[in-house]
């Protein structure tokens, strides 16, 4: 009976894992960017870059000058100063003299039953001058001067409602950073691949574009005002469809931000994200859940069979299992390497194989913590 279960676990796991790697994630990994049609002139519609910030003086000091290096003729920058107690207000006053297209609005308090981030985004969108809104965070930096042009093109030129972009993290030489790099690419493989499959279900507010008019028409974050974190993902999950959304896979259209400095901060942030994912549609939760379950069964069954056949000196069966696991490992490495190059133009150090095994614990432990704390605000 034990052998049967191990074989079932491994067989089911490797079958589903193979399906995700070959049929889903491969869409992002081996995506080929099409050439832009020549001879078609689109109006360069105005864009508002929206950033909400609370006590982000040091980040804004770097971000704002970087934004005004963008190669796009019609844009302004709106900074929502959300109850900052540092030197943010003074910095903005000084920089608005230097950059006439820089605007700011200050929030002195947040209404009850509304999370601060959602209130700040909503206020910023309401006072934005332009209909095309491009969101990022204060700790993010665009990696090229084509960021605005590339990220807003689907909304401006193709009539899309959403444009979903990639946001990565700066590299550091430590285990946490390598895990963050791995998990970021894995998460991107989900939402970019399903987006290419005309089934988008999430995005990141660090690099996201949509129209002000659409946001106001659907009354913004109505229905999840009090949700702590995940405002971007739940908003996209609620309203993005295969016809109104486009994913942008281009290293010139990405942002990079500083990663969390310790595991405690990282896990707190991840718990908020996982809590937000509870508000996804049932179908979309199945997309991620099936991967997590099959991943666990693959590793439990695979390691169990290797031990069983190894102890029993049944080397022919041992080699069959080892070969299948090796094939999956090679495929995983190839997909992560190719996807990283497609998304951000380089391959950060991430120890994909060892972190893939660590994901077994991450998915279940953090998921359990999130479930137990689901009523905690």
Locate each region found by the language model.
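A conserved acidic beta->alpha catalytic loop
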Residues: 73, 81-91, 140-141
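Long helical/loop segments within the catalytic core of UDP-sugar-dependent glycosyltransferases
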Residues: 103-116, 120, 124, 130, ...
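Catalytic donor/gating beta->alpha subdomain of glycosyltransferases that bind UDP-sugars
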Residues: 155-187, 213-216, 222-288
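Short aromatic/hydrophobic "clamp" motif used to bind/position activated sugar donors
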Residues: 133
């Amino acid at each position: 009976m034990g052998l049967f279960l191990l074989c079932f676990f491994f067989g089911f796991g490797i079958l589903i894992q193979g399906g995700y790697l070959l049929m889903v994630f491969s869409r992002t990994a081996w995506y080929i960017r099409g050439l832009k049609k020549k001879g078609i002139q689109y109006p360069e519609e105005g864009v508002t870059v929206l950033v909400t910030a609370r006590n982000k003086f040091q980040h804004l000091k770097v971000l704002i000058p970087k934004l005004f290096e963008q190669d796009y003729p019609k844009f302004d920058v709106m900074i929502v100063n959300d109850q900052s107690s540092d030197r943010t207000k003074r910095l903005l006053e000084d920089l608005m003299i230097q950059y006439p297209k820089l605007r700011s609005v200050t929030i002195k308090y947040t209404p009850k039953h509304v999370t601060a981030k959602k209130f700040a985004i909503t206020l910023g969108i309401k006072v934005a001058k332009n209909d095309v809104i491009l969101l990022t965070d204060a700790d993010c930096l665009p990696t090229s001067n084509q960021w605005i042009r590339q990220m807003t093109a689907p909304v401006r030129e193709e009539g899309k409602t959403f444009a979903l972009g990639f946001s990565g993290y700066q590299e550091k030489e430590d285990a946490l950073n390598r895990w963050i790099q791995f998990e970021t690419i894995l998460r991107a493989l989900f939402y970019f691949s399903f987006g290419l499959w005309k089934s988008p279900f999430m995005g990141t507010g660090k690099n996201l574009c949509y129209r002000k008019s659409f946001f106001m028409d659907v009354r913004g974050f109505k229905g999840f005002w009090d949700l702590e974190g995940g405002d971007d993902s739940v908003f996209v999950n609620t309203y993005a469809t295969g016809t109104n959304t486009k994913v942008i896979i281009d290293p010139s259209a990405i942002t990079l931000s500083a990663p969390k400095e310790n595991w405690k901060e990282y896990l707190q942030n991840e718990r908020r994200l996982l809590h937000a994912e509870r508000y996804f549609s049932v179908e979309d939760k199945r997309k991620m859940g099936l991967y997590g379950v099959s991943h666990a069964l693959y590793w439990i069954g695979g390691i169990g069979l290797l031990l069983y056949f190894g102890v029993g000196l049944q080397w022919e069966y041992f080699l069959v299992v080892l070969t299948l696991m090796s094939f999956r490992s090679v495929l995983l490495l190839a997909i992560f390497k190719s996807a990283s190059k497609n998304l951000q133009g380089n391959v950060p150090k991430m120890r994909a194989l060892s972190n893939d095994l660590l994901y077994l614990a991450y998915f279940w432990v953090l998921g359990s913590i999130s479930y137990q704390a689901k009523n905690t605000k």
